[in-house]
Amino acid sequence: ALRVGVTAPFMLVKLLKPYFNEGASIVNISSSRDAMSQAQSESYTAAKGGIHALTHALAISLAGIARVNSISPGWIETTDKKYDGPDALQHPVKRVGRCEDIAEMILFLCSEKAGFITGENIKIDGGMSKLMIYHDEDGWKYQ
């Protein structure tokens, strides 16, 4: 996972650097798993965290040459299978992400509108990583 997830993007940037045009933008794809884990997912989580770290390091190394950002998607529907019911309802936005949600952010980050954004990792997960999960706990009630 580390060779593909971290070494490959690093080597590609090194190889392609002479060909970057003015205003170049690099968008790496990480995962919301860069900050969350499940048992037996150490290699994947480390690779995704590595992409996040590589992104901010490259943003400094390539300053004035290219802007470098990353996106960390959460659950994204990538097939004809639709996630609904509990899968969708557990997200604060009440749906699972779509490929278009990621594509639109990539287009934005590559545009001049994002000209002052570099070194950032943008999590696109419908708020899932912000949701605290406690069973039988409704939080604090304002009275």
PLM feature segments, named:
Residues 7, 11, 70, 85-117, ...:
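C-terminal helical subdomain
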Residues 31:
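Residue(s) in the substrate-gating loop at a strand-loop-helix junction
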Residues 63, 70-92, 96, 131-143:
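A glycine/serine/threonine-rich, flexible loop-to-helix segment
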Residues 36, 107, 118-143:
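Short C-terminal tail/terminal secondary-structure segment
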Residues 18, 60-64, 115:
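Alpha-helical segment proximal to the catalytic Tyr-Lys
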